[in-house]
From Swiss-Prot:
ATP binds at residues 6-13, 32, 125. GO terms for molecular function: ATP binding; tRNA binding; tRNA-uridine 2-sulfurtransferase activity. The gene is mnmA. It comes from Corynebacterium efficiens (strain DSM 44549 / YS-314 / AJ 12310 / JCM 11189 / NBRC 100395). The active site is at 101 (nucleophile), 199 (cysteine persulfide intermediate). Keywords: ATP-binding, Cytoplasm, Disulfide bond, Nucleotide-binding, RNA-binding, Transferase, tRNA processing, tRNA-binding. It catalyses: S-sulfanyl-L-cysteinyl-[protein] + uridine(34) in tRNA + AH2 + ATP = 2-thiouridine(34) in tRNA + L-cysteinyl-[protein] + A + AMP + diphosphate + H(+). Belongs to the MnmA/TRMU family. Its EC number is 2.8.1.13. The lineage of its organism: Bacteria, Bacillati, Actinomycetota, Actinomycetes, Mycobacteriales. This is tRNA-specific 2-thiouridylase MnmA.
Length: 365
């Protein structure tokens, strides 16, 4: 097969490309340039798309003896990821830009161009697995073997078409073994730290970034009784479950910490309350994305609402026609925010199966 190896410049994508070469595929490495502003991504950033990352990716491809290219997706990245991130915070949501990047850039845009150029699949270093059922039907996307690094959640926004053209060669291996393999292969990235930063906010100051792009949109912080506590500069400064940075001088009547429990972007009102006020028992989601067309109606499954969060059993009521679903949780979850992805899993001894996802649009206690 002719495959594109998506080279982030990290150790995982390096080993993924190496394994694809060893498997006999015709491999071409490609690094995605997602910013035209060299100052927007610092060399010290633990992101995934700096100039240093591009150089690391090139060195790996040179070591493997495969072609290497840099593709400029900066315009599409700005529109589909950065602008979406800003717009979501402006309406009181808490988006995950890495999921949107996977959905719109790393798979959709990359795969679209790759197929147009005659490639059969995209190879990445994600910790997830693809398995084929005995009947030869659609493949299953499963959790990676290394549960500490499992990335199936951030792939839950992909559709059947993308999954059919993906390869995840490192998903059946734990991270320490990946580093050992990289070192044995002579890759300079063998000990390179994992990426954590939002790549377009390399200093980690999300509030300052949003303030620059959204500007001042004053509103009020109130408590559960509606008492005004102070003015704020904009709802983009807050997320559900936030405790730090509220800057409320008057303590709560019961002396307990306050948390952001609701954000109303239309009125600019941020409501704070107790930790118990964060508990939800029902999740509503829209913008559904399922890997199998038969996913409709009701089923019992599990849901995960954060990239490194736990799972909770739930009863899902899926309406594909309305593009909505309701999840009744077996146990409450805390701090669930609109804009997060609710990824559904089917428990399985061979590795939990990703069913699909929706974007959280509301909750109930």
């Amino acid at each position: 097969m002719r495959v594109l190896a998506a080279m982030s410049g990290g150790v995982d994508s390096a080993v993924a490309a190496s394994r694809a070469v060893a498997a006999g595929h015709e491999v071409v490495g490609v690094h995605l340039a997602l910013s035209r502003d060299p100052q927007s991504v610092r060399e010290s950033s633990r992101g995934c798309c700096s100039l240093e990352d591009s150089a690391d990716a090139r060195r790996v491809c040179d070591k493997l003896g495969i072609p290497f290219y840099v593709w400029d997706f900066s315009d599409r990245f700005k529109e589909d990821v950065i602008d979406d991130f800003i717009d979501s915070y402006a309406i009181g949501e808490t988006p995950n830009p890495c999921l949107r990047c996977n959905e719109k850039i790393k798979f959709a845009a990359l795969l679209e161009r790759g197929i147009a150029l005659g490639f059969d699949a995209v190879v990445t270093g994600h910790y997830a697995r693809l398995t084929q059922p005995a009947d030869g039907g659609d493949g299953y996307l499963r959790r990676g073997v290394d549960m500490n690094k499992d990335q199936s959640y951030v792939l839950g926004v992909l559709g059947a078409h993308e999954i059919a053209h993906c390869m995840f060669p490192v998903g059946d291996t734990v991270k320490p073994e990946i580093r050992e393999e990289a070192a044995a292969s002579g890759f300079s990235v063998a000990k390179k730290p994992d990426s954590y930063d939002i790549c377009f906010i390399p200093d980690g100051n999300t509030q300052a970034f949003l303030g620059k792009h959204i500007g001042l949109r004053p509103g009020m912080i109130v408590d559960r009784e509606g008492t005004t506590l102070r003015e704020h500069a904009g709802v983009h400064e807050f997320t559900i479950g936030q405790r730090k940075g509220l800057d409320i001088k008057e303590p709560a009547a019961d002396g307990r910490p306050r948390y952001v429990t609701d954000i109303d972007a239309a009125t600019g009102t941020v409501t704070v309350g107790s930790r118990e006020d964060l508990e939800v028992g029902v999740i509503h989601a829209d913008r559904l994305k399922f890997l199998h067309p038969a996913m409709d109606g009701e089923l019992d499954c599990e849901v995960q609402v954060r990239a490194h969060g736990g799972v909770v059993k739930c009863h899902a009521r899926i309406d594909r026609t309305a593009d909505t679903m309701r999840l009744d949780l077996a146990e409450s979850l805390s701090g669930v925010a609109r804009g997060q992805a609710a990824v559904l899993y089917l428990p399985d001894p061979e590795g939990d199966i990703v069913l699909g996802s929706g974007t959280i649009c509301g909750t109930e206690a």
